[in-house]
A protein has these predicted regions:
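Nucleotide-activated sugar donor-binding and catalytic core shared by glycosyltransferases
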Residues: 1-183
Length: 183
């Protein structure tokens, strides 16, 4: 099954410039920024606190100063995720962004230094805008991915190796979901 209505809509979206976007959202555009797009995985034994501590340590080790988090769905684990962000011993400034809409979401992903998470947009929409991302967890397992998507386990070593590969990769590849019923 190929095709994605979201991807088809994303093709037509004009991205906002970084200054306007960050100013509108009252964010500091000069900080090294990671955009975390994470949805809890249903039917999974995902330890939110353990894995977020690893991600936070990875970001700290790579001098990220700001973590922007897209609002999560209501699947099991989302309350723990939000609680960790609000109550955890964060070594990094974070902001939860809600209701971005597709234009701001794609613009944010384009203008930050790193996009990491497990959302289906990593498979469909982000590659259309030539946005590279680190895909964590098995939430998108079985879906065809492009060279824009870098799979990683949530360990310091694997995240670092994946990030290093992402930074040096410049190739643009074909888009697997641009077949059959799509443009």
């Amino acid at each position: 099954n190929y095709g994605s209505l979201g991807a088809q809509n994303a093709k037509k979206i004009n991205l906002l410039d970084k200054s306007s976007l960050f100013e509108e959202l009252k964010l500091n555009k000069n900080l090294k920024t990671c955009f975390l797009v994470f949805q809890p995985t249903t039917n999974s034994n995902f330890d939110v606190v353990k894995n977020m501590k690893i991600i936070e340590k990875f970001l700290f080790n790579n001098n990220f100063e700001q973590l922007l988090v897209s609002h999560v769905n209501s699947d099991p684990g989302s309350k723990e995720f939000i609680s960790y962000l609000k109550d955890g011993g964060n070594n990094i400034k974070f902001e939860i962004l809600s209701s971005l809409g597709i234009q701001k979401y794609l613009s944010m992903a384009k203008h930050v230094d790193l996009v990491i998470g497990n959302a289906s947009s990593f498979i469909f929409e982000l590659p259309l805008k030539n946005i590279k991302s680190i895909l964590i967890t098995d939430r998108q397992k079985g879906r065809e991915i492009t060279d824009h998507v870098f799979r990683s386990k949530i360990t310091l070593k694997d995240l670092q190796n994946t990030y290093d590969n992402l930074k040096i990769t410049t190739n643009k590849t074909g888009y697997p979901y641009n077949k059959n019923n799509t443009d």
